Amino acid sequence: MVQFMKMTEAAYAAYLPEAIKEYAEEKVKAGTWAEVEALDRSATEYGQLLPDGIQTKQHYLFSIVDDPEQPPVGMIWFQLSESTHGRTAFIFDFKIEEGHQGKGYGRQAMEVLEQVARRMNIKKIKLHVFAHNTRAIHLYETTGFVTTDLHMTKTLN
């Protein structure tokens, strides 16, 4: 079973530029942002969400490890918020590295996340997934997530 290890500053320094780039690419692929603006917008969003990096309050960034002596197989980042409905975790990023996909690490990570959430008295876990990411959608649906909102777009020529 995989484990979550608090992300180190070095891991965060390696993660951030790649995450900014990947998020920009996903927003362009989804048709939400124009390519010319995507990288700047992505960097701005990350700067607003994580102004203090891994030290940002209520944000939890973990490396996902199978063997603590080996490089991580992935990462997960969620934010904790509180409301009248109880504590909620919102997953901002979750990734299993390409060479480790299809080995059950994603499913294991979702199980570990549930354990962590229960220990933190979290009542709900939420996330956003791009509609074109069918592999992720399948993982989330088969681990108990349900669609709560759905945005649709029609491009006019």
Language-model region placement:
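Conserved beta-strand-loop-alpha-helix junction that forms the acyl-donor binding cleft
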Residues: K123, L127-A136, T153-N157
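Generic anion/oxyanion-binding catalytic loop in active/binding sites
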Residues: M1-F4, V129
